[in-house]
Amino acid sequence: MPSNTPSHVVVIGAGWAGWGAAKSLCEAGVRVTLIDGMNDPTGSTPLATPSGKPFEAGTRGFWKDYPNINALTEELKLGNRFTEFTTSAFWSPNGLEATAPVFGDGPQLPSPLGQAFATINNFKRLPVADRLSIAGLLVAMLDLNRNDAVYQQYDGIDALTLFKQLRISDRMINEFLRPILLVGLFKPPEELSAAVTMELLYYYALAHQDSFDVRWIKSKSIAEQLLAPLSQRLRNQHHLDVLGGTLASRLNVSPDGTSVTSVETNSLATGRSAVIHDVDAVVLAVGAKGMEALMAKSPECAALSPELVRAGTLGAIDVVSVRLWLDRTVPVADPANVLSRFQALQGSGATFFMLDQLQPDTQQELWGADPVQGSVVASDFYNSTAIAELSDQGIVDCLMQELLPMVQPDFRTAQVVDQDVRRYPRSVSLFSPGSFKQRPPLETSMSSIVCAGDWVRMEDREFGAKGLCQERAYVCGLEAGNSLLKRKIVSGTTQSQPLQHPVIPIRADEPQVVFGRTINKLVMDQLDLFGLKHPWLRS
């Protein structure tokens, strides 16, 4: 029941998951304190280069099935903050490998026939026979969620092993699947859980013909366009307290070990410690790196919630983000591009985006106070440990001399007039084989601690968006707040609205997928009684 004295929740981490949790709790009348190491996690102060030009830590797209983020923009009355859906191109040392069209522009057919027909002429080098070799993977996808035990069997296999057992051709693996995974899950298939790999490929590419359609922020940054309006509303209307430049250093628990009572913090600017008292619950919207650091300094909490300690031991992936301002406009056919198999990448995957094409109406904003000169390129390197060891100039030279000219030779004659290179070590979750049980659950052993993020196991609140995904992170944040409210761990003062925040499901599976799963389950459940499995699951 609503009360006159609302509960107090501390949300640690101000990514999509943290903001989702803050929204669901604030709107239920709960008092919320949101803390993050960023100087200004509200998005009100744009991230900028030393010369005052805008910068963003990674260029992230918004796919077709992002219903809850779309609903957020409508709720905030933001108008259209996105580009149209765009094409993408895939490049290797051999040149253009494939282009991804805007699938929604063509006649809509059942999946995967629609994707096959829409791209029949888009693969420039990969023979049809190699493309068809992926058929076995579609059967495995039908089997993936038959039951928990089967899912964990797939989770324990690395994706490359599964691909080979399914007899997917080497060319299909190396020229298509490997590049996709290096920029989708940020690791090569031999280092990824087969289960998460199939979830990603299904959600982003195979669920519907137009699942792969993607659009981008059409001016400024995601933080400025989406998070800043949300944070402003939560602060103005719901008294959200935001502490930027602040790290959570310790969780203190009650003497009986049943709940969190306070959160110790550390200011990055001053080094001073402080304590947030009267805490009723905590939302951990952090990754493995943050979880490990926090549990190391919270021994009582670590002892009571060993699953959080295990989560902190999971691997994480290094990312390098680069932005280049050029003295001339370089024409590139597609605004979004993937680079793979180049020796200069040293095993990483890379993307680059022509921001002057994605944001043509606001080019002056891309240049800050300087006059507009030419193209602005944003590039991200994933699985980038080796790349990160290069100097800033070495990374820029790698792009301008070895990678970008392979896409468009005019890059060779362009001059870089400004640049910014930033490294983000261990910043992205690694879904390694067998990692499912190590990933943190949404509801933990301590009832007053919940987890949120795209790496979190959502259990009975599981959502259709999968992998490294803004929509999944945001929804998991909403559900983390909902969990605290539903279980009455916290209560608010709001009486005019339902306590739990609504979550919009993604589009339903197509009939042929539902039918295929049903038939597979009927057959395989019977065969399981005799100890028979699909051949690719036999040890």
Regions found by a protein language model. Give the residues of each.
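Mid-domain catalytic core of redox enzymes
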Residues: 28, 217-218, 246-377, 382-388, ...
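Active-site/ligand-binding neighborhood in enzyme catalytic cores
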Residues: 136-259, 266-269
